[in-house]
Regions:
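Tryptophan-centered motif/residue detector
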Residues: 23, 66, 162-163, 248
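Alpha-helical scaffolding flanking metal-ion-dependent phosphate/phosphodiester catalytic sites
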Residues: 88, 111-123, 130, 134-234, ...
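Terminal helices and disordered tails flanking the catalytic cores of nucleotide-processing hydrolases
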Residues: 1-41, 48-51, 174, 203, ...
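Acidic/His-rich, divalent-metal-binding segments that scaffold phosphate/diphosphate chemistry
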Residues: 4-143, 150, 154-157
Length: 253
């Protein structure tokens, strides 16, 4: 899974295609891991491998990474769930750098982002292509999936308690108007992941609705004026921007 990248200052159109191919390969590898996790040999090592690959691609060129990731998300052939996981994992990695999280917290955050919906991978793909409202059974699965995902990861020999805790509570409501540094690590990471999860879901089109613009998505989460006390939304806007590379914007005229 080693990513071989062209030098940042010597990139041409053909090399962008090479980079897009690398992102596509990464997305496909993640899809395999998430689609049949119980059949993956040494699941923890595979997730770490995907994480290292992601870090290599982002380190090469962050703007190119954002552009290609968002382009891939809108044309993904592997299913919504893996595409959403990759977007969340990438944005969490970028946010961890911006927020200067300790390496252990960064690793737990990104790996939680990649696996938070692992108990409902197939259902998430179905829902993305479903025009009707979720059935009662689907609603139950949606409601219970954080705990089910945590339990599945434990079966897969994940022993990082911070990773497990964040997955298990990733839909919990965590105060976003207190300093991140004052929160416990599991609450701090849950707060970051929750914001990224909502943002990534809003910009992704589904059969039941079109994706929002990146600008509208940020404003839906943080309001028209981003409160600097909401460190996560503020950092998201500062690091990714209201109009990230590779996303569509709606013009006033």
């Amino acid at each position: 899974m080693a990513a071989r990248l062209p030098p940042g200052n010597q990139r041409h159109d053909g090399e962008y295609e090479d980079l897009l191919s690398l992102w596509s390969d990464l997305e496909s590898a993640l899809s395999v891991v998430l689609s049949a996790p119980l059949r993956v040999q040494d699941f923890p090592a595979k997730v770490r491998q995907v994480d290292r690959w992601l870090q290599d691609l982002v380190a090469h060129d962050i703007d190119a990474a954002l552009y290609l990731m968002f382009q891939l998300a809108s044309t993904s052939s592997v299913g919504y769930s893996a595409s959403h996981a990759l977007v969340c994992g990438t944005l969490c990695h970028i946010m961890a750098q911006e927020l200067q999280l300790p390496p252990r917290e960064r690793d737990s955050l990104v790996r939680a982002a990649l696996t938070m919906n692992i108990a409902m991978t197939a259902l998430q793909d179905v829902l993305a292509g479903q025009r009707e409202k979720p059935t009662a059974a689907q609603q139950d699965a949606i409601r219970n999936h954080p705990q089910e995902s945590q339990a599945l990861l434990e079966r897969l020999f994940i022993t990082d308690n911070l990773w497990l805790d964040v997955v298990g509570q990733h839909h919990a409501s965590i105060s976003d108007r207190v300093p991140l540094a004052s929160q416990e690590p599991h609450d701090r990471l849950t707060r970051i992941l929750g914001t990224i999860d909502r943002y990534a879901a809003m910009i992704s089109p589904r059969k039941s609705r079109a994706g929002r613009s990146a600008t509208d998505s940020v404003r839906a989460i943080a309001g028209h004026e981003v409160d600097q006390r909401d460190e996560v939304s503020y950092t998201l806007v500062r690091s990714v921007g209201l109009c990230p590379p590779g996303t569509f914007v709606r013009l006033d005229n």
